[in-house]
Amino acid sequence: MSRRNQAVGAYGERCALQHLITAGMRPVERNWRCPHGEIDIIAWDGPVLAICEVKTRRTDTFGAPAAAVTGPKARRLRVLAAQWLAETGTRADEVRFDVLSVRVTAAGPPRIEHLKGAF
């Protein structure tokens, strides 16, 4: 991944994090990593633990941002969530998997779509 794409992705994650906070969610972890992958954001939405995948795009050339979360990616996030829960000892009655699509434009603020329970 190019440095420019990394910068766009990092910017999108910061925007998504602020969006979640503004919506009243409580982030507990950001960019959690293990040998099997990474979870972008983990946050409480009331009693529900949300595992959030952030996808940022500058154009729709390669499709909508959320379309990048394919079956294999969803399965990997489920495994990562189980590992995070086990490692931290966190208990949650409900775990939800969300996708935040961030579209960055040259003019104006980014557009953020929060798909709760995306998979």
Swiss-Prot record:
Gene3D superfamilies: 3.40.1350.10
Family: Belongs to the UPF0102 family.
NCBIfam families per record: PRK12497.1-3, PRK12497.3-3
Organism: Salinispora arenicola (strain CNS-205)
Name of the protein described by the UniProt record: UPF0102 protein Sare_1228
A molecular function GO annotation: nucleic acid binding
Domain of life, source organism: Bacteria
InterPro entries with a match to the protein in the record: Restrct_endonuc-II-like (IPR011335), tRNA_endonuc-like_dom_sf (IPR011856), UPF0102_YraN-like (IPR003509)
